Regions:
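Positively charged, low-complexity intrinsically disordered leader regions
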Residues: 1-28
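Catalytic phosphate/nucleotide-handling subdomain of diverse soluble enzymes
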Residues: 192, 277-304
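Active-site/ligand-binding-proximal alpha/beta "capping" segment
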Residues: 98-169, 256-262
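Active-site-proximal loop->helix
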Residues: 29-34, 43-101, 187-191
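Alpha-helix C-terminal capping segments
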Residues: 16-23, 45-57, 162-168, 278-288
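Active-site/ligand-binding loops adjacent to catalytic centers
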Residues: 78, 86, 90-113, 166-269
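A short, small-residue-rich loop immediately preceding and capping a beta-strand
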Residues: 24-50, 54-65, 143-156, 175, ...
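Short glycine/serine/threonine-rich phosphate/pyrophosphate-binding segments
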Residues: 8-14, 37-53, 68-71, 122, ...
Length: 304
């Protein structure tokens, strides 16, 4: 995966359309509007890598706390970096996302991994679900019962679930969407809807403004999933309901523990990439999953 995570899968389908439009003469190669993304992690790295390969200008909108080291990487890839402080008249939410949306309003191309900003990203994201389903079909072992995956903005988990459902249908394993106790807007939204007895998919989606709102002061070692809103929460919600899965919040100590296990096992994943594993570690600790159960954990995001 380009850039050390699944993010390029989401972005490549957007880039494929843009290049196709140029080849068909629908879009001028000589007057390329800049690409734009709000991220300071794997998505930004993947976006800048693809933009460099396509010789396409890109603006990356980042929070002020982005590390200088990561900024150096984006600089080497030719990205224009915009550190986004909160302004006095900003509404709630991530300032980097607000500045990104302003750039799109001015004509930039949303080169993003959030479905509500550019739904084309969801097409490429489903490939990881298809691949996992294919591998499970080849296996002659017991059927995988649960799939654990990290949740930040939600496109990764939602596309994984959709891809599994596309390929495996009613035999798709239960999708477990994992967030940390320091930032869990998706679990909060799902719990609120369940407590209100809202079961219809369309009605749940219509409650967006009531249940999905910015998380105050996100914090976790898994800093790549600190999206204060789960932008693609509807897709993830439908995936867990369709497969009999759940939204799971894990304590921060379990995030740390799971990353330690992954490193000891020889994986080079970051704490973000092992957040799904933290969900399994938690479920084993509380007895929700038997130690001989067959499960899958999707780890995406290399340590840097």
């Amino acid at each position: 995966n380009v850039g050390g995570s699944q993010k390029a899968r989401h972005l490549f389908s957007i880039l494929l359309l843009l290049r196709s439009q140029e080849l068909l003469g629908v879009r001028s190669r000589n007057e390329r509007a800049p690409l734009a993304i709000a991220s300071c992690g794997n998505a930004a790295l993947a976006a800048a890598t693809l933009a460099l390969a396509a010789d396409w200008p890109i603006d990356v909108y980042v929070p002020i706390w982005m590390s200088d080291g990561f900024g150096d990487v984006l600089d080497r890839l030719g990205a224009r970096i915009h550190r986004c402080e909160r302004r006095g008249d900003d509404p709630p939410g991530d300032p980097a996302m607000l500045r990104f949306r302003e750039a799109v309003d001015r004509g930039a191309i949303p080169f993003t991994v959030q479905g509500p900003e550019n739904a084309l990203c969801l097409d490429g994201g489903r490939t990881i679900g298809w691949e996992l389903a294919e591998q499970m079909a080849w296996s002659d072992a017991r059927r995988v019962g649960r799939v654990y995956v990290q949740v930040g903005g939600g496109a990764f988990a939602g596309c994984l679930g959709a891809g599994l459902a596309d390929s495996a249908g009613s035999s798709a394993p239960a999708l477990v969407a994992v967030q940390t106790e320091g930032c869990a807007p998706f679990e909060r939204a799902v719990r609120a809807l369940d407590e209100r007895g809202v079961t219809d998919d369309d009605e749940r989606a219509s409650r967006w403004g009531d249940v999905m709102y910015p998380w105050s002061d996100p914090s976790s070692l898994a800093d790549g999933i600190l999206d204060d809103e789960t932008y693609d929460w509807i897709l993830v919600d439908r995936a867990i309901r369709r497969t009999g899965g759940e939204a799971l919040v894990v304590p921060e100590r379990t995030v740390v523990e799971a990353h330690g296990h992954a490193v000891e096992a020889g994986f080079t994943a970051s704490p973000t990439g092992t957040a799904g594993l933290a969900g399994l570690v938690h479920d084993l600790a509380v007895g929700r999953v038997d130690r001989d159960a067959r499960v899958a954990v999707v780890m995406s995001g290399v340590a840097r």
